[in-house]
């Protein structure tokens, strides 16, 4: 049975470095990769990917844009990993990054978390150094911390 690995990304191009780390240290026949993007609840319009209404686009343009960027980043990451031969799934979850990452890692029974060490995108909070430190302090599994940028 494959080991489960959680990859916490953001919507910036720098997230590609985390996928590179995963491909370097994980093996398709040994690991199942779960891509996670934690999004601030301020920028959440829908719980699930869905088209935006004209009213939502007018009333919450920034939130619609951020959510769309996040959904695209997760889908792109999953595609890259699947193309490399990995069983991979992705999710964007609204909430505080530490809570989301720790919660998903526990729920999935992850044996490893891969994340960045500093803020890498305009989503702004996912990979802040304090976030990484808090995650490390709260989980009982190894955390592979990638270099940002």
Go through each PLM region and give its residues:
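Structural beta-alpha unit
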Residues: 1, 76-113
């Amino acid at each position: 049975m494959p080991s489960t690995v959680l990859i916490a990304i953001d919507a910036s191009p720098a997230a590609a470095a985390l996928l590179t780390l995963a491909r370097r240290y994980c093996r398709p026949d040994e690991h199942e990769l779960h891509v996670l993007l934690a999004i601030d609840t301020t920028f959440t319009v829908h719980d699930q990917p869905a088209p935006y209404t004209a009213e939502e686009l007018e009333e919450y343009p920034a939130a619609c844009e951020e959510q769309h960027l996040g959904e695209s980043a997760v889908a792109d990451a999953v595609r890259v990993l699947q193309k490399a031969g990995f069983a991979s799934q992705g999710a964007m979850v609204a909430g505080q990054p530490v809570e989301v990452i720790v919660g998903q890692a526990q729920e999935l029974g992850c044996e490893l978390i891969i994340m960045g060490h500093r803020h890498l995108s305009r989503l702004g909070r996912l990979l802040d150094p304090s976030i990484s430190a808090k995650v490390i302090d709260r989980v009982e599994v190894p955390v592979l911390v990638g270099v940002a940028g």
